[in-house]
Amino acid sequence: MLRFTALTTAQNRKPVAVPENGKRSELFAQNVFNEEAMRQLMTRDAFAAVMNAIHNGTKIDRRVADQVATAMRDWAISKGATHYTHWFQPLTGGTAEKHDAFFEPVTRDRAIERFGGGQLVQQESDASSFPNGGIRNTFEARGYTAWDPSSPPFVYGTVLCIPTIFIAYTGEALDNKTPLLKALSALDQAATEVARYFDKNVSKVTTTLGCEQEYFLIDKALANTRPDLMITGRTLLGHQAAKGQQLDDHYLGAIPSRVLAFMRDLEQECLLLGIPVKTRHNEVAPNQFELAPIFEEANLAVDQNSLLMDVMRKVAERHDFVILFHEKPFAGVNGSGKHNNWSLVTDTGVNLLAPSKTPIKNLQFLTFFICTIKAVCEYEPLLRASVASATNDYRLGANEAPPAIVSVFIGEQLTQVLDALEVSSDNLSPEEKTELKLNVVGKIPDLFLDTTDRNRTSSFAFTGNKFEFRAVGSKANCGKPTMVLSTIVAQQLTEFKKAVDALIEGGKKKEDAIFKVLRRYIKESKKIRFEGDGYSKEWEEEAARRGLSNHKTTPEALKENISEKAVALFESTGVLSKVELLARYEIGLEEYVKTVQIESRVLGDIALNHVVPTAVRYQNTLIENVKGLKEIFGDSYQEVAAEQLELIRHISEHIKVIHSQVEAMVEARKHANHLPDFEAKADAYCTQVKPFFEVIRYHCDKLELMVDDELWTLTKYRELLFN
């Protein structure tokens, strides 16, 4: 049987030898066309033009583009590249690339390597073949990819990969990068203006991001015996193993030797590509692990995380693993997330979300800290929508990840600081102001010396010098949640600046004006702050009283993206137009429908073509056994064969339910497929098709416990998770 052959194969595997290629610091970014490489290979004027484009967003003219392309081509060929590609991130959530050779014949007998500014700056692509929400049709398919100078090109394998944006012929964004860049630009502008209240030398604020990538590793031979794992990325059925994660013995435990070899190989690949991987460890669930890089500028961090997942898949294959990024591949053990650590840093080297040792710097910290909380309070439904997907629905609110309710955790000490600021008067005496600055604002750094609590049930937590958005799914593209978070904070900082300036014009001193607005924001955003157990029923009831949203399903959450408030936000900041928002709403619904549809088809197939035939085969064995007992014991056989007869009856009952439920699920699917639009289809798949999954699974899992282990064809949880 394939299952037992796969088990033997998995158990006999040895770690793949991974040669060390020198010091890690010397490997770093060898295959990246970064600032150092450009400085060495480009003219001074061309280098200055590219730096200006990266830091100030200025356009590069065709002459300079040709010089850059020539330097890039020569560098890439020296690294073994034979092809180039515009590497982009369409709304599939993954990456896309088309390889074109540098090779070009010039005569019948001679060829050269050619790559010019035209090929570097812009390429044409078929936009209708990617998710576009109706923006592009087959008969008007043209789309464009355009070079993003702020994310350095890299050589992977034999291909020069040039990070690009992807837009329609009519200008609408068809990717995750374009609106992200616009959001980061809006936040830079808004944050810089506010930061200049405290330091006139600030001319730029950069958003930083660090993505903690969780994943499962399963032996390839074992994974190949599970059609559900190979097609959907998760197990649609399977009884839980007797041992799961209840002993807490996997988290931070010794890394298995095969996995460690994979990690070492992966890290070397990542370092060559400039991905600054730092931390590796076992996660909570069996066969679950985490990799975390050092934070980077947000646009680059998003690119690197997308690249990282591609690299992880390829390296896993070399080590005879299948890597699972699905948010909930196994029932009964933790799923996987991707905590996004978000912060703001000035070009003067100050982290705006890190407390300082001086009251004035801490006032700056409080300004950005409180404005971020206020932004989350105002737009929490959009943050929830930014992480909504059919796969992440299985994880959110499952007592292992943040609930679907967005709340902000800041810890007891900072709560006390905000409470003290909230009750302070507008008309403080000089002595009271000094007291407030020295003993409340001034002592913030000291608070962090003893702050060790971490509320894992909060979706948005302050962790000392950054905010950690924990609701992001492990397979998600980080561009979407980062774009939304950056946009709402940009909008809030803009509103803050207007309010403070109005008070200053009215005669208030700058510091008093800032305190006044911050006090108002503390009061208005109090409902989003929560320090307790986010998993509890009491919090769900309390959140409802506070007026916080609780969108438990993706179709429900995605509706927030096209609300009047959302459209006004994204249009006013210039991040997304109403047309783009409507398109993304349709794309999100379509993806949800297709994901649930595929899972439904696979589940029905496995139930009827694997589980039921195996159960019938075992039932026939039992029937033959009962017949034999009857021959031996005569009329008293029923007493002797009571257990077998009961088992035969139970198997028939489970098979009957499976058949009827699969049939009903297929009919529900047919009904959903004939509904007029994706909004109706998504609601139908969510409320009418998906509920069958658990019922069918329950009866299949019961049969797994009854059927002879020697006959069961599907690899079991204990074998998948403990090999």
Task: Tell where the protein language model's regions lie, with residue ranges.
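Active-site-proximal loop/turn and secondary-structure-junction residues that shape catalytic pockets
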Residues: V64-V68, F88-P90, G118-Q119, F166, ...
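Short linear, low-complexity motifs centered on an aromatic residue
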Residues: G93-D109, S128, G133, R226, ...
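N-terminal hydrophobic targeting/anchoring segments and the immediately downstream early-domain regions
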Residues: M1-N21, T138-F154
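Hydrophobic/aromatic-rich, well-ordered segments within soluble, folded domains that form packed cores
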Residues: A81, T85-Q89, Q304-R318, L344, ...
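Glycine-rich, acidic/polar active-site loops that bind/position phosphate-bearing ligands
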Residues: A141-F325, N334-G337, L344-E586
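C-terminal amphipathic alpha-helical interaction region
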Residues: R520-N723
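Active-site proximal loops enriched in glycine and acidic residues that flank catalytic Cys/His/Asp
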Residues: V64, F88, G116-G117, P293-F295, ...
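Histidine/acidic residue-rich metal-binding segments in metalloenzymes
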Residues: Q11-G116, V121-N137
